[in-house]
Amino acid sequence: MRASQSPMLDPRARHLLRTLIARYIRDGEPVGSKTLAQHAGLDVSPATIRNILADLEDIGLLSSPHTSAGRVPTAHGYRVFVDSLVQMQPPGEEEVRRLRAELASSNGTQSLLGSASQMLSAMSHFVGVVSAPRREQFAFRHIDFVPLDARRVLAILVFADNEVQNRVIEPRRAYEPAELERVANYLNAQFAGRALSDIRASLLRELRLAKNEMEQLLAHSVDLASEALVPADDDGMVMAGQTRLMGVQDLSDLDRLRELFEAFASKREILQLLERTIQAPGVRIFIGEETGMVSLDDVSLVTAPYTAGGQVLGVLGVIGPKRMAYDRVIPLVQTAAQMLGAAMEPPGTR
């Protein structure tokens, strides 16, 4: 979780701030001193509470809407809340069981990512988002080449996670079917189980050492592999539940909502934000302007990386209003990241 420079608050001010924010998150209405006097469990007068709330407003943790006598948290107030005041509520046994069952029924990486994003959305009631692993992180299991015409070849790649990619390539010269078969057999025999990022470098290294007829086979392999095994321009991210934000009271400004949905549609900026968190251990929380994206000024993003095979594969998270139930969403994201990573472990290591 991101560290921040929280103001020094005495225990009474911390308790009132926690109570006010928790109640505002629950009800969505500004909270006044009388309400806090009734529900905070402190033996102090409403006048004393008003003075403390005024102090919290002076240091930027609360604000007073013009139409209400109550107060609401600012983005800075939410930051202090999630960094030092929130009391986590981990997912219940039934939620964990549902999440595990949904992931277990998924076949292949894309299906797993889709299930994870849908379950995050369903359990948080907001937007679930998962960044996809880069293909070059996966070992390739098998490759076939199918001639399409004089210049084009269909490369069929099967990866260790059972995903299949079809790529139409245009090698430097025309190949006979027998040549394509020979190259495919060589690549499958020598490089099955290796990551894409390793294969081309190995081919070039072996080509420098090769002699005679082996040199020709390797040269053909380099030509075809240079096209077929480059990282593909994948979508990069799976999202679910975007329309859930349309009914959120805090996101009623249509112009701002349109900007948000345009960001959802393009995905590029959100994916860049997720990429910024991929090497950060544990949960990261961006509140409003902390994202650095104008289109996300009115929302919060809770993320965590997921890992398998000892390496970070991607990031998942929840996008929702700043007034979200952080006590539930933060541990939900943590749990989902752990379970998605476990589901993506190679067979035999789970």
Swiss-Prot record:
Recorded name of the encoding gene: hrcA
The organism's place on the tree of life at top rank: Bacteria
Alphabetized UniProt keyword annotations: Repressor, Stress response, Transcription, Transcription regulation
GO molecular function: DNA binding
Family membership: Belongs to the HrcA family.
Transmembrane segment boundaries: none
GO-annotated biological processes: negative regulation of DNA-templated transcription
Record's protein name: Heat-inducible transcription repressor HrcA
InterPro entries cross-referenced by the UniProt entry: GAF-like_dom_sf, HrcA, HrcA_C, WH-like_DNA-bd_sf, WH_DNA-bd_sf, WHTH_HrcA_DNA-bd, WHTH_transcript_rep_HrcA_IDD
Described function: Negative regulator of class I heat shock genes (grpE-dnaK-dnaJ and groELS operons). Prevents heat-shock induction of these operons.
SUPFAM superfamilies tied to this protein: GAF domain-like, Winged helix' DNA-binding domain
Claim: S-adenosyl-L-methionine is one of the keywords in the record: no
